[in-house]
Amino acid sequence: MGTIFHLDIVSAEESIYSGPAEFIVAPAVMGEVGIFPQHTPMLTRIKSGVVRVKAPLQDDEEVYVSGGMLEVQPDVVTILADTAVRGKDLDEAKALEAKRKAEEIMKNKISEIEYARAQAELIEATAQLAAIQKLRKRGH
């Protein structure tokens, strides 16, 4: 039984992490899941939240994801995220401004399409702010 597996975290924009991991914790829709080497194969949806990565001989890394898919094979784990941002790169001021703008658009009740877009942006900004608070509590 191996002590590490290969992890890829990718979004439509870029590859955020590609390398060895000892374990990860990911925000699956069914609740947080912990993945160790030789885990039973699994395919599940993930929700907005923080993926925690324990890599050998490195500091733990946190990556914010806004949803997507998690595929687990015994020696390879892949996270295909809608959006992925390293925890240290999350911008609280930007998220607060996006939240404020989305709320303002929703108040003005423009078209249904603009309302739906603003609602999605509000959900994204709120999830990023929650991730920032969670990381702050952990001392990052």
Swiss-Prot record:
GO CC entries? plasma membrane; proton-transporting ATP synthase complex
Report the main location listed first in the record. Answer: membrane
Q: Which InterPro entries match?
A: ATP_F1_dsu/esu_C_sf (IPR036794), ATP_synth_F1_dsu/esu (IPR001469), ATP_synth_F1_dsu/esu_N (IPR020546), ATP_synth_F1_esu_C (IPR020547), ATPsynth_dsu/esu_N (IPR036771)
What SUPFAM superfamilies would the database entry show?
Epsilon subunit of F1F0-ATP synthase C-terminal domain, Epsilon subunit of F1F0-ATP synthase N-terminal domain
Query: Where does this polypeptide localize?
Result: Cell inner membrane
Which UniProt keyword terms apply here?
A: ATP synthesis, Cell inner membrane, Cell membrane, CF(1), Hydrogen ion transport, Ion transport, Membrane, Transport
Q: What's the stated role of this polypeptide? A: Produces ATP from ADP in the presence of a proton gradient across the membrane.
Q: How does it assemble?
A: F-type ATPases have 2 components, CF(1) - the catalytic core - and CF(0) - the membrane proton channel. CF(1) has five subunits: alpha(3), beta(3), gamma(1), delta(1), epsilon(1). CF(0) has three main subunits: a, b and c.
Protein name per the record: ATP synthase epsilon chain
Species of origin reads Nitrosomonas europaea (strain ATCC 19718 / CIP 103999 / KCTC 2705 / NBRC 14298)
Designated gene of the protein: atpC
